Amino acid sequence: MNIHEYQAKRLLHTYGAPIANGVAVYSVEQAEEWAKTLPGPLYVVKSQIHAGGRGKGKFKELPADAKGGVRLAKSVEEVVANAKEMLGNTLVTKQTGPAGKQVNRLYIEDGADIDRELYLSILIDRTVGRPAFVVSTEGGMDIEAVAEETPEKIVTVAIDPAKGVTDEDASKLADALKLEGQAREDGVKLFPILYKAFTEKDMSLLEINPLIVMTDGRVRVLDAKVSFDGNALFRHPDIQELRDLSEEDEKEIEASKYDLAYVALDGNIGCMVNGAGLAMATMDIIKLYGAEPANFLDVGGGASKEKVTAAFKIITADPAVQGILVNIFGGIMKCDVIAEGVIAAVKEVGLKVPLVVRLEGTNVELGKKIINESGLNVISADDLDDAAQKIVAAVKGN
């Protein structure tokens, strides 16, 4: 689960992280009212959407030379003028895709006199099985570009969960970020604060880009992105209250109601698979044969007929889908259950696109019999390679 920048910063501030004074607003009137409560004279007006690259993003409704989703203002009047342009309009960034996201709230905060911009994140390093800090002196920019062009400027420090952030860890991080004097003191205090927030709130990612050193030598969290482990949300009702459903894909919300692992993508071939590994392999082979998957969808090992029906309906609800591939290897999951679910869904919503079904494993013959006797126009496949070629050919034939 993701939250907005202002929510992330407020959460980190409760642990003691230094942030600027700021207010979240939902209207131009609120922007004017609350901006007057900030010290000024420099303000930053930030679009609040669940996507990165806001500063370099562009609003669909504005001229091409208009400013992006993060803007500086030197007066309350400029804050208001920017709010009028930003609220209600669609911001397109490298992470939103061409559709963009509508900006329904802004975060207005005090400006800062910046000396240096740094990068810091905490995530789970699965190669060592521990939380790890990833830091770089190249903050305020695309960390992926830094990793590709100058990987030596990125430093990773794994943390022993039994010890937490030790003095040695903090010193390594301060050295990697080249912090000196007051900035080093602030950093050494901040690192364990961030780690505590990360672990106590079951975060999967905590990213600060940039973490700034101001001209007075103090360190401040200037931007924050936080994602939480969805499997641990039951422990954190306070975090669940921060969820903004308007920022989430409607199909993904519906899938979560049935405990389906669904991620919307930009392609045109819908996929329903059991098992994350097989689902990824299915998407790979679709791309291999020149098409693009419309989604990742893992129905899991013990799905019921109702769950399979819901999964199929979610796929067909995507107008971009021009074909569907059902790829099931039955272990715990039984092929006849998949067949019954698919047939029930098709009878309810209709079938307007080609459907290829590949079944293998438990009750496979019964599953194939159910589909063959259903009277539906279903294309059978013998294996994954055959299934991928058939669905790609069927879609391109349309």
From Swiss-Prot:
Entry keywords, A to Z: ATP-binding, Ligase, Magnesium, Metal-binding, Nucleotide-binding, Tricarboxylic acid cycle
Domain of life according to the entry: Bacteria
Pathway(s) it belongs to: Carbohydrate metabolism; tricarboxylic acid cycle; succinate from succinyl-CoA (ligase route): step 1/1
Cofactor(s) the protein needs: Mg(2+)
Keyword Repeat: no
Family of the protein in this entry: Belongs to the succinate/malate CoA ligase beta subunit family.
Protein name: Succinate--CoA ligase [ADP-forming] subunit beta
Organism: Brucella anthropi (strain ATCC 49188 / DSM 6882 / CCUG 24695 / JCM 21032 / LMG 3331 / NBRC 15819 / NCTC 12168 / Alc 37)
UniProt lineage: Bacteria, Pseudomonadati, Pseudomonadota, Alphaproteobacteria, Hyphomicrobiales
